[in-house]
From Swiss-Prot:
UniProt protein name: Cilia- and flagella-associated protein 70
Comment, domains: The conserved TPR domains are dispensable for ciliary targeting. The N-terminal half is important for cilary localization and/or binding to the axoneme.
Alphabetized UniProt keyword annotations: Cell projection, Cilium, Cytoplasm, Cytoskeleton, Flagellum, Repeat, TPR repeat
Basic and acidic residues composition-biased segments: 410-428
Start-end of each TPR repeat: 498-531, 635-668, 669-702, 704-736, 888-921, 923-954, 956-988
Entry GO CC: axoneme; extracellular exosome; motile cilium; outer dynein arm; sperm flagellum
Keyword rRNA-binding carried by entry: no
Family under the similarity heading: Belongs to the CFAP70 family.
Entry function: Axoneme-binding protein that plays a role in the regulation of ciliary motility and cilium length.
Organism: Macaca fascicularis (Crab-eating macaque)
Region of interest (Disordered), residue spans: 410-457
PANTHER family, sorted: CILIA- AND FLAGELLA-ASSOCIATED PROTEIN 70 (PTHR44314:SF1)
Length: 1009
């Protein structure tokens, strides 16, 4: 063999051994292997006798030269395999001059690992039997016959730059469905071809052709998974057509990237893929893209967006016998018909991390003006660039009709090298041929359709033809940040989570908690006692006899047991007792014996009784009247108070409530989010950012914290950080519609149209999936109640921390019409629809999102615009079995309506319900106003006192307290309340005038008198 030129590198293929072989003439045939690559025979092995076990040691090495400058290129290695044909040598018979041979099977070696940077690899490839081969019936071992193959190059074929910057493009053409009715399987043979171009060497375009599609009648769906096939003809063994480990798997239409992926397209596609005629290719073609081609590919996608994929058919020409090596033109050659084009949106390949797009694409008639407008492509692959591709269109091969150079002389051949490539792909250097159509002539060449009219191509549109195409890259054109990197970047940007405060005095804390529970329960029992026997009973306690006290005790015990309060008190105390057992007595395991348990219980009982007495003595000293009860407020109550402070635009008080929540529970993420939203309302963006980042430091996987941090980063123009936050959110929760939408808005700000399109497309996709799931759930639900509950869950998922910035109660403001302010939408609708019937209101109410607290107007405007219909709407709302999302504000609005209409009994009832559900300063104030107007002064004073205890900075509360004191004749208290009212600057002029009038009537209450 000749020496290999210095510019080339030798690729060696060694077949070491074969397994489970057998021949036509027994289980120990004489066989040899022929290696072929690129339609050139690389060599034959020695003749080896197969052992009785079916194995044969060939140790046969063949090679070819890799020379990208003019021989075998990287692209050849990408889409052309090495064929290993095993042939049996039959024994010579008498008077037989030459040996007879029969082909047993063919194996395929994919050289793709060489393009992945490997310099050698070893593999076991199956030996596919030819038709009629004895290998079709496996041996008793039931193993498929195979060959052990090693591939070796002296050094890697790719440089480091090529490995990092290059890419491998795989294009799979599955089928064309719903083809025109004029396509019939009988009559003259037709070659159905599809082609597209991709950048190859720099700016050069490389045609990829798929030829000889099979026209099939409808009747059944194509099976999945089914193997992808090599784009090479004349493969001897049927199984060798299949690319190893490459399958067409299909998938739901909704997950495709094409044009027919909407729910309304499902019926048409099902009919087309089951009933109608189709053309099947199932071919995968590969193309290596060097680094410059990758850059050109990216630039072309960004500039053109749509990629033309042409489809046509040309008649097959049968070669007469004895002229197989000649290329004779006939009258039928060169006739390009049914020239169509599909526009493939390649933009998704520029989305971060996307390596594959697959979908169905409509086929349209090929018209120059339309193609140029959509794709900026001036020339047609079939008609202009490759007009001569339709020549030499003979039966029996997916033939590339451009000439190609012969393989290096050192390759061993047993027949001349043909000037035709059988893979359906021209050489990269050949595509530089000028267009066959003269640039100065408007006259089409023979077989070229008119440029502005294509009646045959129009049949594709009439039939609804579409092709199913897959384009896959080995590496994404735009790398996507890994979740680990995003998490690391987020961790770098947020402050470290502060360490939890070390718990000290566990036993002391447990006893203190027990004291607190005893005090709370004792107050509750005392309140029940007062309710049953009156508050004045304490003054008469010394004058009562023992029988009366015992009778009251029995009545109280009976009431506590019957109402279930006794059981509730025990449950309330249970947790504190458990903490004492664990923290003070260090008992965390079960007792070994019953005696030990009883001893411990006795000891514990004595301790608990003693501590109960200690707590009761602290709570109830001898001078009971001198004790001032401390009102305990929960975190949710503080949150509600903060919202009400926002309503009154008392932001200082609201901030105090939010900070109180943070002091109590600094590790509660929601508290930080609420305070951050409040800071946004007051336009303190720096403080809001601190709060959101603090929340994120507590849980770096919390989606809403990430999104809010991203929003603040945009507001503060920290765009790089914003992208990190939004990307991390979409990575942690890929189905979150809000996260994708915010990411799209961010890219819109950055004028990044491609990524904006990607994010909005994903948001729309996830939203449609959620809507479909909600629709299915709704159909399964039985009755209105389940439907309302399910809607409530969807509402709650929009905002996990409740009402957002702009929160307000109905007493102060009202929301204008707009997205999310459903109550105001309802109000406006009712104002404009005075003839609305009551039976039509319920469906409206059941479909509204009850959130009256966003972007609201001052209460005086709200009061002036209240129509009569609103009262009925709110009454119906509170009568539903399932509550609306914010019933607190519904009660406040309805109570305000009643007060304005002077229906004080209804107002009292409504505010009492509000006080039971979620007591606040405003609910007690409303109840106090209603009681005062009903002349129930004692109840009014009690309610106003409760309101004052919750917020003693409310001027209206002090005003009504002054009115009550004036009515009952308590001069000192009246003057004191009036002073606080003036100090807090009461704004209600009518109420102030009423106080002055009453002061003049009674003659006191105003220190200026």
């Amino acid at each position: 063999m000749e020496q290999v030129p210095s510019t080339g590198r030798l690729v060696q293929i060694t077949v070491t051994e074969g397994y489970d072989l057998k021949g036509f003439k027994g289980d120990t045939p004489v066989t040899f292997i022929r290696a072929e690559f690129n339609q050139v025979v690389l060599g034959d092995s020695a003749k080896i006798t197969v052992s009785p076990e079916g194995s044969a040691k060939y140790n046969f090495t063949s090679s070819f030269e890799f020379n990208p400058e003019g021989g075998i290129t990287l692209d050849d290695l990408a889409h052309k395999p090495v064929f290993l044909t095993v042939t049996e040598v039959l024994p010579k018979e008498k008077k037989q001059k030459e040996e007879k041979t029969l082909i047993l099977g063919q194996a395929v070696v994919d050289l793709l690992p060489l393009l992945e940077g490997q310099s050698s690899f070893q593999t076991t490839v199956p030996l596919h039997p030819v038709q009629g081969s004895p290998l079709e019936t496996p041996r008793s071992s039931a193993k498929q016959c195979s060959l052990e193959v090693k591939v070796l190059v002296a050094e890697p074929l790719l440089t480091t730059a090529q490995i990092s910057g290059g890419n491998l493009l795989k294009v799979t053409l599955e089928a064309a469905y719903s083809v025109p009715e004029s396509f019939i399987p009988t009559g003259p043979g037709q070659n159905y071809m599809v082609g597209l171009q991709v950048p190859s060497l720099g700016e050069k375009d490389y045609p990829i052709l798929f030829k000889n599609g099979t026209l099939k009648l409808g009747g059944e769906r194509e099976p999945v998974p089914r193997p992808k096939k090599w784009p090479i003809a004349n493969i001897l063994a049927p199984g060798a057509n299949n690319i190893p480990d490459a399958f067409i798997v299909g998938g739901p239409y909704e997950e495709e990237e094409g044009e027919l992926n909407h729910p309304e397209d499902s019926e048409f596609r099902n009919q087309a893929e089951c009933i109608k005629k189709r053309i099947i290719w199932d071919l995968e073609s590969r193309c290596y893209l060097d680094p410059s081609a990758v850059v050109s590919f990216q630039k072309r996608i960004a500039d053109c967006r749509l990629w033309p994929v042409e489809i046509t058919r040309v008649p097959l020409v049968t070669v007469p016998k004895g002229k197989a090596g000649k290329t004779e033109k006939t009258d039928e050659e060169g006739q390009l018909s049914f020239h169509g084009v599909a526009y493939v949106n390649m933009v998704p390949l520029l989305y971060p991390g996307v390596k594959r797009i697959r979908g169905a694409f409509h086929v349209y008639p090929y018209l120059d003006s339309v193609v140029h407008e959509k794709t900026k492509c001036l020339l047609s692959l079939f008609r202009d660039i490759g007009h001569h591709l339709i020549h030499n269109n003979k039966i029996g091969g997916i033939n590339s009709l451009l000439s190609k150079q012969a393989v290096s002389k050192n390759l061993k051949e047993d027949k001349p090298v043909k000037e035709k490539d059988i893979d359906g792909r021209p050489r990269p250097g050949d595509v530089q041929a000028p267009s066959i159509k003269s640039q100065s002539s408007d006259t089409p060449l023979e077989g070229e359709p008119p440029l502005s009219h294509n009646p045959e191509g129009q049949q594709y549109v009439e039939a609804g033809t579409y092709i199913v195409l897959e384009i896959q890259l080995d590496k994404a054109l735009v790398p996507k940040r890994m979740p680990e990197e995003l998490a690391r970047r987020v961790k770098e940007m947020i402050p470290p989570r502060p360490p939890l405060t070390r718990r000290t005095g566990g036993a002391q804390k447990a006893v203190s908690d027990y004291h607190t529970q005893i005090k709370n329960i004792s107050r509750a029992i005392l309140d029940e006692y007062y309710r049953m026997f009156g508050k004045q009973v304490a003054k008469l306690e010394s004058d009562m006899d023992s029988e009366t006290l015992e009778e009251q005790k029995c009545q109280l015990s009976y009431e506590l047991n019957c109402s279930g309060k006794y059981f509730a008190f025990k449950e309330q105390l249970k947790h504190a007792v458990v903490k004492i057992v664990r923290e003070k007595y260090l008992k965390t395991t079960s007792f070994e014996s019953q005696e030990e348990l009883q001893t411990f219980i006795s000891e514990l009982y004595v301790f608990l009784v003693d501590q109960m007495h200690v707590a009761l003595n602290q709570t109830m000293p001898d001078d009971v009247q001198g004790t001032i009860a401390t009102i305990f407020t929960s975190s949710e109550q503080l949150r509600l108070f903060a919202f009400e402070a926002e309503v009154n635009e008392n932001f200082e008080m609201a901030a105090a409530y939010y900070k109180e929540r943070l002091v109590r529970e600094p590790q509660n993420l929601d508290h930080w989010l609420d305070y951050g939203v409040f800071c946004l309302l007051t336009e303190d963006n720096i403080k809001a950012q601190e709060c959101f980042r603090k929340a994120l430091s507590l849980n770096q996987s919390h989606i809403h914290s990430l999104l809010l941090c991203g929003v603040l980063a945009v507001l503060l123009e920290n765009y790089e950080q914003a992208e990190i936050f939004f990307e991390d959110a979409t990575c942690l929760e890929p189905t979150n519609v809000v996260a994708w939408t915010l990411l799209g808005l961010y890219y819109e700000i950055q004028n990044n149209d491609i990524r904006m399109e990607m994010a909005f497309h994903e948001a729309s996709k996830q939203l449609q999936a959620q809507m479909l799931q909600a629709q299915v759930t709704k159909q399964k639900s039985a009755g209105v109640v389940e439907d309302v509950e399910e809607r409530g869950k969807r509402e709650s998922s929009l905002g996990p921390w409740g009402i957002t910035n702009g929160s307000a109660t109905a007493i102060k403001v009202e929301a204008p019409a707009g997205p999310g302010a459903a109550l105001s939408i309802l109000d406006k609708f009712l104002e404009e629809s005075s003839k609305l019937q009551s039976d039509s209101q319920e469906p409206i109410l059941t479909t509204q999102t009850w959130d009256p607290s966003i972007n609201q107007k001052p209460s005086n405007t709200f009061i002036k615009e209240i129509p009569t219909k609103k009262e009925a709407c709110y009454e119906r709302t509170i009568s539903f079995v399932v509550d609306a999302s914010e019933m607190h504000f519904i009660f406040l609005r309805l109570g305000l309506i009643y007060l304005e209409e002077k229906e004080y009994e209804k107002a009292k009832k409504t505010y009492m319900q509000a006080c039971k559900r979620s007591p606040s300063c405003l609910t007690w104030l409303g109840l106090g106003i209603a009681c005062y107007r009903l002349e129930e002064l004692t109840e009014a004073e009690d309610a106003l006192s409760e309101a004052n205890a919750l917020n003693n900075y409310n001027a209206e509360v002090w005003a009504y307290l002054a009115l009550v004191c004036l009515k009952v004749g308590r001069q000192l208290e009246a003057e004191q309340a009036y002073k606080y009212m003036i100090k807090l600057k009461l704004k209600d002029e009518a109420l102030l005038a009423e106080i002055h009038t009453l002061q003049e009537t009674v003659g006191f209450g105003n220190p200026s008198f």
